[in-house]
UniProtKB/Swiss-Prot annotation:
GO BP: 'de novo' IMP biosynthetic process
Name listed for the protein in its UniProt record: Phosphoribosylaminoimidazole-succinocarboxamide synthase
Keywords, in A-Z order: ATP-binding, Ligase, Nucleotide-binding, Purine biosynthesis
Entries under NCBIfam families matching the protein: PRK13961.1, purC
Listed GO CC annotations: cytoplasm
Entries under SUPFAM superfamilies matching the protein: SAICAR synthase-like
Main EC class the enzyme belongs to: ligase
Catalytic activity annotation: 5-amino-1-(5-phospho-D-ribosyl)imidazole-4-carboxylate + L-aspartate + ATP = (2S)-2-[5-amino-1-(5-phospho-beta-D-ribosyl)imidazole-4-carboxamido]succinate + ADP + phosphate + 2 H(+)
Organism: Komagataella pastoris
Gene Ontology molecular function: any one: ATP binding
Pfam families found in the cross-reference section: SAICAR_synt
EC identifiers of the protein: 6.3.2.6
Gene3D superfamilies from the UniProt entry: ATP-grasp fold, B domain, Phosphorylase Kinase, domain 1
Length: 304
């Protein structure tokens, strides 16, 4: 069974509903993040979900928050069920609510969000490859190496920010100069440097586990001292492209641990961008298997 919506009967106020997460206010300082099993492709959310997807994303994010803790503070307050439920109203421990929250919930501290998607690309693929083929630029910036092939590694990872769109709208790629206009030059520079540092640390670790992190998206907030804090989800198959190092081959697109099964199925059935679509059960199962494969490879733990 998958959980595509949560309903806490108003015990906590629902303040936001994203493509995957339902966000509730716990008190004036803290939020409850609940990762549902919703999945979207081509900016449309499917009517059914991938069983346990939200749990896998949550546990993988917790792993990476812990791994990156020497590099940056994060917004986690409580990340295991015992700690989470201890900070919630006792009524939410009733089975009706507990079954919606177990294994997929985090309590996080509120921060002032920096309104940028901090995207870091280590390998040339997707929209970056299309742009490079046409103009030898990525994100409007000339690339030094004019002989890159699809899926090649960049000489050094590059920061390519985008706007943070409301649900139902598209994130828009922007230049670093435009990003600096939105958040200020100082914060923009800090975000760029930190995002590349975090990506590089994670990429090097994942390579040891047989996973290539081709690119990823970070989100940051600011604490009371105007210091950067890592927020949202971190280095999951929803926010990153993960490739299998064993099958990696320059010069072509790579199979990734993400929504590719779903995208391919939608395309084959002419359902791109259509609302109200339910996945075939087989697609949901195959997608879950990919998420688990990524989780197990990176964490070294079996998914129970």
């Amino acid at each position: 069974m998958s959980i595509v919506n949560t309903d806490l009967d108003g015990i906590l106020p629902l303040i936001a509903k994203g493509k995957v997460r339902d966000i509730y206010a716990v008190d004036e300082n803290n939020l409850l993040f609940v990762a549902t099993d919703r999945i979207s492709a081509y900016d449309v959310i499917m009517t059914n979900g991938i069983p346990d997807k939200g749990k896998i994303l949550t546990q993988l994010s917790v792993f990476w928050f812990d791994f990156l803790a020497p590099y940056i503070k994060n917004h986690l307050v409580a990340s295991n069920d015992k700690e989470v439920f201890a900070l919630l109203p006792s009524k939410l421990s009733e089975e009706k609510y507990k079954s919606q929250l177990e294994g997929r919930s985090l309590i996080v501290k509120k921060h002032r969000l920096i309104p940028l998607e901090a995207i870091v690309r280590g390998y040339i693929t997707g929209s970056a490859w299309k742009e490079y083929k046409n103009s030898k630029t990525v994100h409007g910036v000339k690339v030094e190496n004019e002989n890159l092939q699809e899926s090649d590694a960049f000489p050094t990872p590059i920061f390519t920010p985008s706007t943070k769109a409301e649900q139902g709208e598209h994130d828009e790629n922007i230049s670093i100069e435009q990003a600096a206009e939105i958040v200020g030059k100082d914060i923009c520079e800090k975000v760029a440097v930190k995002a590349v540092e975090l990506y590089s640390a994670a990429k090097n670790f994942a390579l040891l586990k047989g996973i290539i992190i081709a690119d990823t998206k970070f989100e940051f907030g600011l604490d009371e001292n105007n210091e950067l804090v890592l927020v949202d989800e971190v280095l999951t198959p929803d926010s990153s492209r993960f490739w299998n190092q064993k099958t990696y081959q320059v010069g072509k697109s790579q199979e990734s641990y993400d929504k590719q099964f779903l995208r391919d199925w939608l395309t084959a059935n002419g359902l791109n961008g259509k609302e109200g679509v339910a996945m075939d059960a087989e697609i949901a199962i195959k997608s879950k298997e990919k998420y688990i494969e990524a989780y197990e490879a990176i964490t070294g733990k079996k998914w129970a």
